[in-house]
């Protein structure tokens, strides 16, 4: 196993992979193209964290959602999955604010369960 310049592990000459875990479980994704996965237990939508990590449109989505904590967790996993697929890691909260709207490189598949949400980011 080797690591890229941002610390993401990879296997030379092997498929791409991504691993994530939380209290509710573990998730692994493998593909021939860059891929990212994030799994999170449903987390509280803390107002300060919302403002630091979500753009204005996402903030409105969270605040108007019937279940704000689920919406926050959904958006968070989408952003994390893309960052993992890119292999760059989260550099700043500002990066998270603009990550999804400008992103046309990845197709996202989000699955919601009772206690957790996970998203897989597939390279287009």
Question: What are these model-predicted stretches?
Answer:
Residues 1-124:
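Core catalytic alpha/beta fold that binds nucleotide/phospho-ligands
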């Amino acid at each position: 196993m080797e690591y890229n310049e941002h610390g993401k592990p990879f296997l030379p000459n092997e498929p791409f992979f991504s691993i994530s875990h939380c209290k509710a479980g573990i998730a692994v994704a493998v593909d021939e193209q860059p891929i990212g996965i994030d799994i999170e237990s449903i987390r509280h939508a803390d107002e300060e964290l919302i403002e630091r990590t979500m753009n204005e449109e996402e903030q409105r989505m969270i605040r108007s959602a019937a279940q704000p904590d689920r919406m926050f967790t959904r958006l968070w996993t989408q952003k994390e999955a893309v960052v993992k697929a890119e292999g760059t890691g989260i550099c700043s909260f500002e990066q998270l604010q603009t990550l999804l709207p400008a992103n046309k490189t990845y197709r996202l598949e989000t699955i919601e369960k009772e206690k957790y949400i996970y998203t897989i980011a597939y390279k287009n």
